[in-house]
Curated annotation (Swiss-Prot):
GO terms for molecular function: ATP binding; identical protein binding; S-methyl-5-thioribose kinase activity. Belongs to the methylthioribose kinase family. InterPro entries: Aminoglycoside_PTrfase (IPR002575), Kinase-like_dom_sf (IPR011009), Methylthioribose_kinase (IPR009212). Homodimer. Catalyzes the phosphorylation of methylthioribose into methylthioribose-1-phosphate in the methionine cycle. Contributes to the maintenance of AdoMet homeostasis and is required to sustain high rates of ethylene synthesis. Pfam families: APH (PF01636). This is Methylthioribose kinase. SUPFAM superfamilies: Protein kinase-like (PK-like) (SSF56112). Optimum pH is 8.5-9.0. The gene is MTK. It comes from Arabidopsis thaliana. Its EC number is 2.7.1.100. The keyword ATP-binding applies. Pathway: Amino-acid biosynthesis; L-methionine biosynthesis via salvage pathway; S-methyl-5-thio-alpha-D-ribose 1-phosphate from S-methyl-5'-thioadenosine (hydrolase route): step 2/2.
Length: 420
């Protein structure tokens, strides 16, 4: 079988593809054996085919982009080129944070296909762990490290402007995925759209209130402008709890197909916003045996620790590289400790506010927009689910409109507790 043109693979044709690709076959022993490979299609996301492949001497994952959105169908076309940007970002971020990004073994641009490390059990999607009430002792440490390194080292704090513009230009090609985000995060929840849904009839008035909130629309317009215009760093672009796989001592970030040079706060906010959604969903998963109160406190500690560790590590990287190639703040201008500290405090304050705003926007779209989260969807009783969603929605609306009043992540955590 020829693979010179794009062909959607199935379990049978994937065997032929792997055996004809040394970079893959050598990883799992398929180059030395005619034994059948064990292949399982496990894609549960919105966009792609995902296969787990096990051979005589190893395993790997194959991810293939389709020319449409899988969860909707061919009526919503989507470029296969997103696979190129995903593979490129996995490699770039993997170089910067190798402990927290799976290795890429092979990329085929024609087939829109990536072969990468299989994150074997007990790795599970973080979102599923949060639903199950599992604590991860290294989560805040690992995620803050990943975000600090990937965001700092792809920004003008480390790049010179020529290098940065070249990198920005390359990722401008991921325009379709950016436009999808613009639509589902910054537009559809604030207007009537066939793609929107919510827990009806319980949240009918809540969804209408979002569409009629002028102050909310003013804030979301500012965030959309920042998302479209601010090429601050190479961001993952979809860093929710479904894009992280975990064990008790491992944290791996996957699926950066939405990556581009955008505002740092979009990644930080997406991640923290999804932790906040997980917090508000806990009451829907509580039982007589486990009221989830202790687990909710763990989530809040994780939120606070993640930002505080990120802040500390980001500033440390800045200090270590203040005389390096970065051209955002030239060393001969910001040339004393006092002025540099002032600049850093201002930068991180703005970044916190950006992160809170984007996090709130991501929360809102998951409640009254398209593509909801399993944290809420797995709450079987509609009324119970709606109560949890309403609390999260009210908090997100407040956070979006009043984000600039928060001086620390601790104040945000206190506000979450008051809302619950």
């Amino acid at each position: 079988m020829s693979f010179e043109e794009f062909t959607p693979l199935n379990e049978k044709s994937l065997v032929d593809y792997i055996k004809s690709t040394p970079a893959l076959s050598s990883k799992i022993g398929a180059d030395k054996s005619d034994d059948d490979l064990v292949i399982k299609e496990v894609g549960d996301g919105n966009l792609n085919f995902v296969f787990i492949v096990v051979g005589s001497s190893g395993s790997l994952v194959i991810k293939q982009a389709l020319p449409y959105i899988r969860c909707i169908g061919e009526s919503w076309p989507m470029t296969k080129e997103r696979a190129y940007f995903e593979a490129t970002t996995l490699r770039k971020h993997g170089n910067l944070s190798p402990d927290h990004v799976p290795e890429v073994y092979h990329f085929d641009r024609t087939m829109a296909l990536i072969g990468m490390r299989y994150l074997e059990p007990p790795h599970i999607i973080l979102r599923k762990g949060l639903i199950a009430g599992i604590e991860y002792p290294f989560l805040a440490d690992h995620m803050s490290d990943y975000m600090a390194k990937t965001l700092f080292f792809t920004s003008l704090l480390y790049h010179d402007t020529t290098e940065h513009r070249r990198a920005v230009t390359e990722f401008c090609g991921n325009v379709e995925l950016c436009r999808l985000t613009e639509q589902v995060v910054f537009s559809d929840p604030y207007r009537v759209s066939t793609f929107n849904r919510w827990t009806s009839p319980y949240l009918d008035d809540d969804a209408k209130a979002v569409r009629e909130d002028s102050a909310l629309k003013l804030e979301i317009a500012e965030l959309k402008s920042m998302f479209c215009e601010r090429a601050q760093a190479l961001i993952h672009g979809d860093l929710h709890t479904g894009s992280v796989m975990v064990t008790q001592d491992s944290t791996q970030v996957i699926d950066p197909e939405f990556s581009f040079y955008g505002p740092m706060g979009f990644d930080i906010g997406a991640y923290l916003g999804n932790l906040i959604l997980a917090f508000f969903a806990q009451d829907g998963h509580a039982t007589q045996e486990n009221d989830r109160k202790e687990y909710k406190q763990w989530i809040l500690r994780t939120i606070e620790q993640t930002w505080n560790l990120f802040n500390k590590r980001f500033i440390a990287l800045w200090d270590q590289n203040k005389d390096g190639p970065g051209e955002a703040y030239l060393a001969d201008i910001y040339n004393n400790t006092e002025v540099l500290k002032f600049v850093q405090e201002n930068y991180m304050r703005n970044l916190l506010h950006d992160s809170l705003g984007f996090g709130a926007a991501k929360m809102i779209r998951r409640i009254v927009g398209v593509a909801h989260v399993e944290d809420f969807e797995s709450i079987e009783e509609d009324k119970r689910r709606a109560i949890c969603e309403r609390s999260a929605l009210e908090f997100a609306k407040m956070l979006l409109k009043e984000r600039r009043k928060f001086k620390s992540i601790g104040e945000v955590v206190s506000a979450i507790q008051q809302q619950s």
